[in-house]
Amino acid sequence: MIGIDTCFLIDLYWQDSPRNKNARALFSKIVNDDSVQLAIYFNCFNEFLHVITDPKRFENAFSIAEAIDVIDFWCDLDRVKVLYPDDTSFKRTLAWMNMYKLGRNRVNDTQMASCYLSNNITSIITANPKDFEIFHSFELQDYRKKK
């Protein structure tokens, strides 16, 4: 099972993103490989909703309804599992925040990584590998790089 970072969802749907083409190519590859199962940390959807509907960031920002339709689409896919934190992942998040001296801007990514690890997810699709490298727990699939 492969975890998805929020940036992948945003780049997949934001057509003007410089990473859109690579995100779409990777998505097509995933869709065509029935053996690939995906995991999405629940808060990725909250972040997606927050970012993709922001008219200050996007000239053609999604409406709330459009963003929710995208989220519903992902939640309904058979090969996608939405993950939620548990006590272990929450405590690991706090431990990692202390251990790696991470600041407040790293809370969401740290909690996502911890939840993925608790669910035996060892690979993450991201355009921000530096957010996860510090944990030494994941194979990072950086879709910015053409393969």
Where is each model-derived feature located?
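Aromatic- and histidine-enriched alpha-helix N-cap/loop-to-helix transition segments
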Residues: 40-46
